[in-house]
Amino acid sequence: MSITLTQLRTQVRNMVDLDETDLPDSIVDQFAREGFQRIYALERRWPILQESYTFNTVANQREYTISTIGDIREIISVVDTSTHGARLNLIDYNEAEGIWLGNLDVASRPYFYSFWDKKLQLWAKPDIVYPMTVRAFRNPVYTWLSNVDEAIDLDEWFHAILPYFIIARVYQRQEDSDLSAMHMRSFDEGVAFARRDLMKASSAQPVVMSGGKQYPTLQRWLQTLGRTL
């Protein structure tokens, strides 16, 4: 069940038996933000952050500011969805700039992408407009701190756990180290259980270790399917 900041404030005060005078909103909100950030510091790929975005390339334009595509934290894949499109391969920027250099930097269909300076680079730079779909993990949203009736941007697993972090900080503020440590352990244990459940591999798609699955190289693709395009 989702929880809002308003509900979180009430829940915490009820659990520690304090009123708004003794535990003002500003303190609860500060601790809530800290616990929220601690959870997101553990993983960059929480399932709740999964998103898909689309954009169109511009002829002869290599770089695209990531923030104009979406509020992206980490890109997983870039796919050219045109008729003869393909999934682009990630390439290191240093390697790419050494290949597409001088007279060799000719505009054509891009097959590679890289990141640098908060921008997405396409290699080669597009010769025409290509529709692209980006699968990515977005950044966490903090609007729940100002819109107190908006659900906190966490998986519901953590909505029941976050109060324990705030309570631990409240008792720490009151210099009650025993109760603070007890509630922090409850928070840490709850987060560990949630993390294990949310991040484990799907039973329908077991983890394949290195060497267990072969992927065609771009060269092989060009020798087979690519030559018929």
Predicted segments — roles?
Residues M1-L229:
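Glycine-enriched, solvent-exposed interface loops adjoining structured elements
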